[in-house]
C-alpha cells in the first residue's frame, strides 16, 4: 500500500503533468462552463443537472482524474432516471396484481394463465394440465425377462448386487428408499434421450420418437421424486448420499450407453423390476399399518389425476404401475438392439403409461 506521503507526491506530479498531456483549456474559464451547460440543454432539452455542473467544477480543478469521475456522475444520473421510469411503470401496471410480484422484462415473455377443466386456476408451474395422466393400474406386474445371454446376466446381477446395500441402509424406511430409487431411476431416460438427441443431430436423421419417450420417462420419474419429497423428509446425510450416488450412476450409465445401448436398457429394465418389488413391499407395510397412510400430496393428486380424498397408498399404486411401464419400454428397447436394429427403426411407444 502507498503511504500518505507517496499519495500526496503522486497527486502533485499528476497536477503538473496534467496541463501538458491533457488539454483542459476549454474548461479553465467561464466560457467552458457555458459550453458544458449549453451542451446539456442541447442534448437533454433541460438545464444541466447538478451532477453535470459538478462535473465542470471537478474537471476544472482536477483535470486528470476528472474524466473518470465525470463518467461516473453521468452514469449515476442515467441510473437515477431509469429507476424513476421503472417506478412509474410499476405504479401504472400494479392495478389488479395485488401482492403478487411480476417480472417486467424488455423481452415481453409473460407466462400464460392456465386453468383446470372446472375453470379454477392451475397452481403448478412445474407441469401443465395436458401433461397429467391417469395411470393404467391393470398392467401385469409379474412380467420378467429371463436373462439368457452374457450381457443379460451381467445386467441382472449388477442390479441385484445394488439391492443389498440399499436394504441394509434403508431397511424398513420405504419412504426414503423410494426417494433414493427415484433419484437414480430419473437418470437413464435423460442420458439416453440426450445421447439419441446428439446422434440425431450428427446423422441428420429422425429418432423414431425415442427421444421424447426417454425424456418423458425421466420427467415422470422426477415427478415421482417430487411426490415422495412431500412424504419423506430426508436427513442431511441422506441428501449427501443422493448427491454421491447420482454423480456416480450418471457417469457410469453414460459410459455404458455409449459402449452398449442394449446393455444399458437391459439394466434399466431390471432396475424397474426391482422398483416394482420395492413398492410392493411398501404397500404391504401400509396395509399392515406400520407406515401411516397419510393423505396424498397435492402434487400427486393433480399430476396423476387422483380423487381429492386419495391417500399415500393410492399414490404408491400409481407409481408402481408407472415403473412397470418403464420396465416394458426399456426391455423392448434392449430387444430392438439385440435383433440388430436401431431404435429409430421401430416406432417408440409415445405416451405408454
Swiss-Prot record:
MF terms (GO), sorted A to Z: alternative oxidase activity; metal ion binding; superoxide-generating NADPH oxidase activity; ubiquinol:oxygen oxidoreductase activity
Transit peptide start-stop: 1-69
Induction: Up-regulated by acetate, citrate, antimycin A, cysteine and H(2)O(2).
UniProt cofactor(s): Fe cation
Chain segments annotated as transmembrane: 178-198, 240-260
Phenotype when changing residue 126 to A: Loss of disulfide bond formation, activity and stimulation by pyruvate
Keywords: Disulfide bond, Electron transport, Iron, Membrane, Metal-binding, Mitochondrion, Mitochondrion inner membrane, Oxidoreductase, Respiratory chain, Transit peptide, Transmembrane, Transmembrane helix, Transport
Cofactor note: Binds 2 iron ions per subunit.
Cellular compartment(s): Mitochondrion inner membrane
Highest rank taxon of the organism: Eukaryota
UniProt KW Transmembrane helix keyword: yes
Residues that hold Fe cation 2 according to the record: 221, 272, 323, 326
Topology class, membrane: Multi-pass membrane protein
Record bears the keyword Electron transport: yes
Task performed by this protein: Catalyzes the cyanide-resistant oxidation of ubiquinol and the reduction of molecular oxygen to water, but does not translocate protons and consequently is not linked to oxidative phosphorylation. May increase respiration when the cytochrome respiratory pathway is restricted, or in response to low temperatures.
PANTHER family noted in UniProt: ALTERNATIVE OXIDASE
Subunit structure: Homodimer; disulfide-linked.
Protein name: Ubiquinol oxidase 1, mitochondrial
Organism whose genome encodes this protein: Nicotiana tabacum (Common tobacco)
